[in-house]
């Protein structure tokens, strides 16, 4: 049995999670502590890097103590941290702390990819991840990936050419007066609307477009133009706009993800990242995977957002695959590509 502590500080959530790796490869969640600074960013309409970094400094120590107490440990066998991608200052807080704990405890350090952590979070609820196509959707990233195993290099099939899906959600939510962060507020509003009342364009979905690339900038612009043109109409309903926008996003994401799994002959589709908590995306993915004969895996909403548990899970998978630790002088990398799971 090996215990792995994961630290996540890539954006505005301070996460400390602890996982247990058993000899048979099973990964069990022992502790998951998250402190968010989102309320401090609301008045700015987005994450302010300096505020996020200071919040991590204040929250990390208490979160560490709570996680160790919850797991019943004095120290773990391994320490891991998000090395990138993310906000430079925020990453430095978590990486510096993880290296210090690693040195003080005399345990190995693993520098892992934040995005790989999102993929790994699913193992807590559904067991070891088989070969799969993964749709990774969050506030800053939208990728379609071929994952043979979490211990091997990840193959990128496609990504967004402009806005990430989560970024589009936040911008449209702001346009509709829903505030920041907008993902959940827009999802809740969309449930009360008619998703067929307004049909918004599906970017990069034509026969000449890249089969696995995404674009949400045009959709965002279409929503803005619709609001500008119809705001004075007697029947103007923001719920219908939200529902139509959400349907356009979920339609393209699930269509391309299922298409990739079918084309590659891969039986499992994994959806991960913060946007994976969206109700319509989960519903439509379930429907389309059923029609295509694919197995769908999506973590519970609480594991879709940023947390330390996912970093612990990813590091545990690397340990199980025989990956060596990272050196303590490895630098953080705000632009780390999704294909590189570990920096060493």
UniProtKB/Swiss-Prot annotation:
Transmembrane segments: none annotated. One of its GO terms (molecular function) is iron ion binding. Its EC number is 2.3.1.234. Substrate binds at residues 136-140, 170, 183, 187, 278. Fe cation binds at residues 114, 118, 306. GO terms for cellular component: cytoplasm. The keyword Transcription does not apply. Keywords: Acyltransferase, Cytoplasm, Iron, Metal-binding, Transferase, tRNA processing. It holds the Pfam family TsaD. Its cofactor is Fe(2+). It is found in: Cytoplasm. InterPro entries: ATPase_NBD, Gcp-like_dom, KAE1/TsaD, Peptidase_M22_CS, TsaD. Its main location: cytoplasm. Binds 1 Fe(2+) ion per subunit. GO terms for biological process: tRNA threonylcarbamoyladenosine modification. It comes from the Bacteria. The keyword Cytoplasm applies. It catalyses: L-threonylcarbamoyladenylate + adenosine(37) in tRNA = N(6)-L-threonylcarbamoyladenosine(37) in tRNA + AMP + H(+). Residues 325-344 are annotated as: Disordered. Required for the formation of a threonylcarbamoyl group on adenosine at position 37 (t(6)A37) in tRNAs that read codons beginning with adenine. Is involved in the transfer of the threonylcarbamoyl moiety of threonylcarbamoyl-AMP (TC-AMP) to the N6 group of A37, together with TsaE and TsaB. TsaD likely plays a direct catalytic role in this reaction. Belongs to the KAE1 / TsaD family. HAMAP family: TsaD (MF_01445). Interacts with RimI. This is tRNA N6-adenosine threonylcarbamoyltransferase.
